[in-house]
């Protein structure tokens, strides 16, 4: 029931808006998740859902932790609520200046709040971008002795945006996902089926693109790319 309320509220608060006539290949909706902070009831409901998700994992002995870490400024309010509720220490990441398109680059990533060696840390993020920032943050934490027990992802965009982390066997725990949000809105006549289909089509194509971007390609694929590049150079001469 909590999720259904959240889905509807994301629309009514205009955190999510649909584009009337999206151009082919363009994201068919707009999401400004920071708007949630201007709607206290919605923010509290999402925070409670995240908290309950962690409690279930903890009760089932799937995770054990002593620190909560916000990996972006947008995640700090949620991490603060959760750390207070669980009476755990809180950390946050300052990554200003990090080249997030460079995998394993840990320069300009600062862990604020006092991390100790062997801390067991849950990461909190609102939305993941299709880059290597989280990979770099995880590497930084581990280099300085922290243990990452899981990443709580508040909204899964269903675009393969963290496919690199799943292939690295990182424990990703999504709380909400875009498919469920739009299916709920369509089932309750808040949007047309057309928009659900557009979102699904966009996400499928974006996932394919992100797999190519974020994962190392097989050698035969690299050879094909190199061959095509040579042909393009030859034609242009």
Predicted regions mapped to residue ranges:
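Short, glycine/charge-rich flexible loops or terminal/linker lids adjacent to PRPP-binding catalytic cores
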Residues: 76-136
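Glycine-/small-residue-rich active-site loops that bind phosphorylated ligands and cofactors
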Residues: 38, 74-75, 129, 157
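Active-site-facing substrate-recognition patch
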Residues: 1-61
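Conserved acidic residues
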Residues: 66, 119, 149
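Phosphate/pyrophosphate-binding loops at sites that engage ATP/ADP/AMP, CoA/4′-phosphopantetheine
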Residues: 50-65, 138-147
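Short glycine-rich phosphate-binding loop at a beta-alpha junction
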Residues: 61-72, 152-153
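PRPP-dependent phosphoribosyltransferase catalytic core
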Residues: 1-10, 15, 139-237
């Amino acid at each position: 029931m909590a999720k259904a309320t959240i889905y509807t509220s994301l629309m009514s608060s205009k955190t999510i808006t649909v584009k009337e006539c999206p151009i082919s290949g363009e994201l068919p909706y707009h999401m400004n998740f920071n708007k949630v902070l201007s709607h206290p009831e919605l923010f509290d409901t999402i925070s409670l859902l995240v908290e309950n998700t962690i409690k279930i994992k903890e009760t089932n002995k799937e995770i054990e932790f002593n620190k909560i870490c916000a990996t972006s400024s947008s995640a700090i309010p949620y991490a603060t609520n959760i750390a207070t509720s669980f009476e755990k220490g809180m950390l946050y990441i300052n990554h200003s200046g990090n080249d997030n398109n460079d995998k394993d680059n840990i320069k300009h990533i600062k862990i604020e709040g006092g991390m100790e060696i062997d801390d067991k840390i849950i990461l909190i993020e609102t939305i993941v971008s299709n880059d290597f920032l989280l990979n770099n943050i995880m590497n930084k934490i581990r280099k300085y002795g922290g243990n990452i027990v899981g990443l709580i992802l508040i909204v899964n965009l269903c675009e393969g945006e963290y496919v690199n982390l799943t292939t690295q066997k990182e424990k990703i725990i999504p709380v909400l996902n875009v498919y469920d949000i739009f299916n709920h809105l369509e089932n309750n006549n808040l949007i047309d089926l057309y928009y659900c289909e557009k979102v699904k089509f966009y996400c499928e194509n974006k996932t394919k693109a992100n797999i190519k971007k974020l994962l190392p390609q097989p050698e035969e694929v690299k050879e094909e790319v190199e061959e095509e590049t040579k042909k393009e150079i030859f034609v242009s001469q």
